[in-house]
């Protein structure tokens, strides 16, 4: 009897174990089925987002490739690559269609006076510029020179030197000044490291490298407008072939050409009418550095200038 009972117990145990295994198997399958459905739902939801993200990345890459980010110059905030200008192998400043005299006149007409600017100390600090020589009509401003205008001035002097030599004349520009200008342009060229590739078109016997090739440039007119807004009232007077301005009795005469409506007009008028009034920014003994001949020339210049003012007002 005991053996039979034991056999029944074993069979019951086996049956229960089999049931449990089957139940676990069914439940495990149910869990796996639920997990698969959840994973499938997540994939279905994520797929559109992944596709949209992929498309946006492609569009962004294409935008960056096709259109460069906008960049601006340090001080005048000139936009890089703003205008398209074709390169010309020869212009009216150098071609054979104009006479030497006509081309010389064009070069001599270049006036870089506007490149002298007066910038307030606050603005120069914001721009990260070192403090400069004090502007004579406002102690809170310094005098700066646009480097673009400085370089342009050098090209004018180089023309004057080579033109005089070509004409068989002794150049009036000093060779030392020419060396300075050549070195200035050399430094500029190496600083900018222009990587534009000039193409070599087939022009027969004429090797006109880069002729007509389009270039992306800053707008010079916008630089001109920026410096004019900060005018130092400077003017080169009676400029010579040597690149020097003469005919002034005092250095301050060069800073008396303010644009109409300038707030410095009263100071300048007093400076002219009263015979060089010390504005407070000049050394007190500045006038004593002049020779008697220079003082006489200055007095004559003052008289003639004031006479002209009266004539204009009459």
From Swiss-Prot:
Gene Ontology molecular-function annotations: transferase activity
Motif HXXHC 2 mapped to chain: 177-181
Motif mapping: HXXHC 1: 150-154
Disordered, as annotated region: 1-24
Record field: compositional bias (Basic and acidic residues): 1-14
Null allele phenotype: Abolishes the production of chlorinated derivatives cyclochlorotine and hydroxycyclochlorotine and leads to the accumulatin of isocyclotine.
Origin: domain of life: Eukaryota
Keywords: Chloride, Transferase, Virulence
UniProt EC number: 2.5.1.-
Gene Ontology biological process: mycotoxin biosynthetic process
Pathway(s) annotated for this protein in UniProt: Mycotoxin biosynthesis
Entry keyword Transferase: yes
InterPro entries, A to Z: UstYa-like
Family: Belongs to the ustYa family.
Domain text: The 2 HXXHC motifs are conserved in ustYa family proteins and might form active sites.
Function comment: Chlorinase; part of the gene cluster that mediates the biosynthesis of the mycotoxin cyclochlorotine, a hepatotoxic and carcinogenic cyclic chlorinated pentapeptide. Within the pathway, cctP2 catalyzes the formation of isocyclochlorotine via dichlorination of the Pro from the isocyclotine skeleton. The NRPS cctN initially catalyzes the condensation of L-serine (Ser), Pro, L-2-aminobutyrate (2Abu), Ser, and beta-Phe in this order to produce isocyclotine.
Name used for this protein in its record: Chlorinase cctP2
Source lineage: Eukaryota, Fungi, Dikarya, Ascomycota, Pezizomycotina
Gene that produces this protein: cctP2
């Amino acid at each position: 009897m005991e053996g039979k009972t034991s056999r029944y117990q074993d069979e019951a145990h086996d049956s229960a174990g089999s049931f449990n295994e089957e139940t676990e198997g069914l439940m495990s399958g149910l869990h796996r089925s639920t997990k698969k459905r959840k994973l499938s739902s997540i994939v279905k939801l994520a797929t559109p987002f992944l596709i949209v993200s992929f498309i946006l990345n492609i569009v962004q890459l294409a935008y960056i490739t096709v259109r460069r980010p906008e960049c601006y110059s340090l001080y005048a905030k000139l936009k890089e690559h703003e205008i398209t200008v074709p390169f010309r192998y020869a212009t009216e400043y150098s071609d054979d269609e104009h006479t030497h005299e006509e081309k010389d006149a064009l070069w001599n007409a270049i006036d870089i006076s506007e490149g002298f600017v007066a910038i307030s100390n606050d603005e120069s600090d914001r721009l990260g510029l070192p403090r400069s020589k004090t502007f004579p009509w406002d102690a809170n401003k310094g005098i700066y020179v646009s480097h673009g205008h400085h370089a342009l001035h050098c090209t004018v002097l180089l023309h004057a030197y080579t033109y005089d030599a070509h004409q068989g004349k002794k150049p009036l520009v000093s060779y030392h000044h020419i060396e300075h200008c050549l070195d200035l342009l050399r430094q500029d060229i190496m600083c900018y490291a222009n990587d534009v590739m000039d193409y070599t078109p087939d022009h027969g016997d004429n090797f006109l490298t880069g002729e007509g090739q389009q270039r992306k440039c800053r707008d010079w007119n916008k630089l001109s407008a920026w410096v004019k807004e900060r005018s130092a009232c400077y003017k080169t007077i009676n400029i010579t072939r040597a690149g020097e301005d003469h005919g002034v009795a005092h250095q301050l005469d060069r800073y008396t050409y303010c644009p109409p409506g300038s707030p410095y007009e009263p100071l300048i008028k007093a400076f002219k009418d009263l015979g060089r009034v010390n504005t407070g920014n000049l050394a007190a003994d500045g006038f004593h550095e002049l020779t008697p001949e220079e003082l006489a020339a200055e007095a004559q210049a003052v008289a003639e200038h004031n006479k002209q003012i009266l004539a204009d007002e009459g």
